[in-house]
């Protein structure tokens, strides 16, 4: 039996034990792990520092280094996420609906775990804790395959989770990390349908494409984040500017940050000078369509070397960095058509006072989350009140949008009777 098969077999055994684990034990374990994350903050940062130094030496981009870094506040956020997950109602065992058959038997639809989750993700070590916490609360076993860039951070976090969790009553091997960084193991993992029930990839287009094309296990696709803001003709500019700034610059390496702004032509000359100045001050590289570029090219801005003409490749690109494209459109219909063609069905926002345009945008943009006068940065399990998320699904089957506890469950029918047979 191979290394991956051994992990799979252990996970399957653990998943059966998790079926009978009571809510009190799960919550006790999650709270104890949260406390230990705070207690071991320095040790976590020491392991993370090794990954950061290795990343810098190998030439990782600013965006990837940002995703990799664990600061005090991010560790505290991981602990808080576990506390929130512990506070949620346990979804397992919930009766969604029920009725009595005319022959006297009862039929109930009950929420149950998925079983064994295979989680494949890149760079962000906080995903290790979020994924483990959500899996445990939903009574799923999980096999984690993080990025080689974060291997030291992930190993430390996984050992901490298991040491404290098992002491609090979690079944052994409920959470396992693939500690070997050989990429060939991913191919083996995604074909381990004997033991793994579902795969959830979080990462770039290349990773997801490889998994979707090669997996023999059902995949819940968490999409790339080519997110947009459309500034309509009636937009409140004073409101729109800080929303765009937040959506682009607060944490550009995340999938819910925007990559492209669409501006209504009739408002372009009014908003572009101020928008351009603001984002150049923030050191964002701006890639404007030719028409937009002409409006501001003769204006005196600081950091003007970062104002550039866009190419066709910029529209639809996921930068995950301090880079943003911008183009002009004639109306809300054109904005919707553009977003549906160039976006990734993740999160998109409209800035407008026009109720009809707002409703049209919210109804017709084919994305997991659509916003009116709000930053796309709120597409997040924590912000939606889920405690954390195991990913943001951009597909339509099983789950869509931030995936919390309920999205890690399925259902079964429980029928009770006293000797009924079908005639």
Residues of each region from the PLM?
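Rossmann-like NAD(P) dinucleotide-binding subdomain of oxidoreductase/dehydrogenase enzymes
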Residues: 87, 96-238
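Short, well-ordered beta-strand elements within core beta-sheets of diverse protein domains
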Residues: 14-20, 262-263, 321-330, 345-350
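N-terminal Rossmann-like NAD(P)+-binding subdomain of aldehyde/semialdehyde dehydrogenases
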Residues: 1-107
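ALDH superfamily catalytic-core signature
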Residues: 2, 10, 123, 130-138, ...
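Flexible, glycine/charged-enriched surface loops at secondary-structure junctions
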Residues: 23-24, 92, 168-175, 250-257, ...
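C-terminal core of ALDH-fold dehydrogenases
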Residues: 28, 332, 337-422
């Amino acid at each position: 039996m191979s290394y991956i098969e051994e992990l799979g077999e252990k996970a399957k055994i653990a998943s059966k034990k998790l079926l009978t684990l009571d809510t009190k034990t799960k919550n006790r374990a999650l709270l104890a792990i949260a406390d230990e994350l705070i207690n071991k903050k320095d040790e976590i940062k020491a392991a993370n520092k090794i990954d950061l130094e290795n990343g810098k030496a190998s030439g990782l981009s600013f965006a990837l280094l940002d995703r990799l870094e664990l600061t005090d506040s991010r560790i505290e956020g991981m602990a808080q996420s576990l506390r929130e997950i512990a506070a949620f109602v346990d979804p397992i065992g919930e009766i969604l609906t029920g009725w009595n058959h005319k022959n006297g038997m009862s039929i109930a639809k009950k929420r149950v775990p998925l079983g064994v989750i295979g989680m494949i993700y890149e760079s962000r070590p906080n995903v290790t804790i979020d994924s483990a916490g959500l899996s445990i609360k939903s009574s799923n076993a999980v096999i984690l395959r993080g990025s080689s860039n974060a291997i030291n951070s992930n190993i430390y976090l996984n050992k901490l989770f298991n040491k404290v969790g098992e002491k609090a009553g979690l079944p052994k091997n409920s959470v396992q990390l693939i500690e070997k960084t050989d990429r060939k193991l991913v191919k083996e993992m995604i074909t381990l349908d004997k033991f793994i029930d579902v795969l959830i990839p979080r990462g770039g287009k290349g990773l997801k494409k490889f998994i979707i094309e090669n997996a023999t296990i059902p995949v819940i696709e968490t999409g790339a984040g080519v997110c947009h803001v459309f500034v309509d003709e009636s937009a409140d500019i004073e409101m729109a500017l800080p929303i765009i700034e937040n959506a682009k610059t607060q944490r550009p390496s995340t999938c819910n940050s925007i990559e492209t702004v669409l501006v209504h032509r009739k408002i372009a000359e009014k908003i572009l000078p101020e928008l351009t100045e603001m984002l150049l001050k923030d050191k964002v590289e701006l890639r404007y369509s030719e028409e937009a570029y002409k409006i501001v090219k003769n204006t005196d801005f600081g950091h003007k070397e970062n104002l550039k003409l866009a190419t066709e490749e910029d529209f639809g690109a996921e930068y995950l960095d301090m880079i943003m494209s911008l183009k002009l459109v004639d109306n809300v219909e054109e904005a919707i058509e553009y977003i549906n063609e160039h976006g990734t069905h993740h999160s998109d926002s409209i800035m407008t006072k026009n109720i009809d345009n707002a409703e049209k945008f919210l109804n017709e943009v084919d994305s997991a989350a659509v916003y009116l006068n709000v930053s796309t940065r709120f597409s997040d399990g924590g912000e939606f009140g889920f405690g954390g998320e195991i990913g943001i699904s951009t597909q339509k089957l099983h789950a869509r949008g931030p995936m919390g506890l309920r999205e890690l469950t399925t259902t079964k029918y429980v029928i009770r009777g006293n000797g009924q047979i079908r005639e």
